[in-house]
Amino acid sequence: MKVLLIGSGGREHAMAWKFAQSPKITELLIAPGNAGTAEVGTNVDIGVDDHADIVEFAKNEKIGLVVVAPDQPIVDGLCDLLRQSGITTFGPSAAAARIEGSKIWSDDLMTKYA
């Protein structure tokens, strides 16, 4: 299976390192990646905020799974957009990520149910 991992930090490096060990993954692409991810997969020059480009790339490359790791693209709805485009995606919806993305909203929620 071809996997596209979104992100460029240490979390993504650790995930890429582990993904690369799986015999089920035939190709690992990381957008945009970093020097560490380049050692275990192929970095792709697409920014985490370029949602339309990510969807287009995933479709063109016949990606079997997209894993969205950074918080901001999740909060901005990247996982939702990928799913709406028919692409298998690992990551929460924007609605589910709201508790992480808005401290005011999460504080209000916790106060309401405290």
Kindly give the residue locations of the regions a language model identified.
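ATP-binding N-terminal substructure of ATP-dependent carboxylate-amine bond-forming enzymes
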Residues: 1-95, 100, 104-105
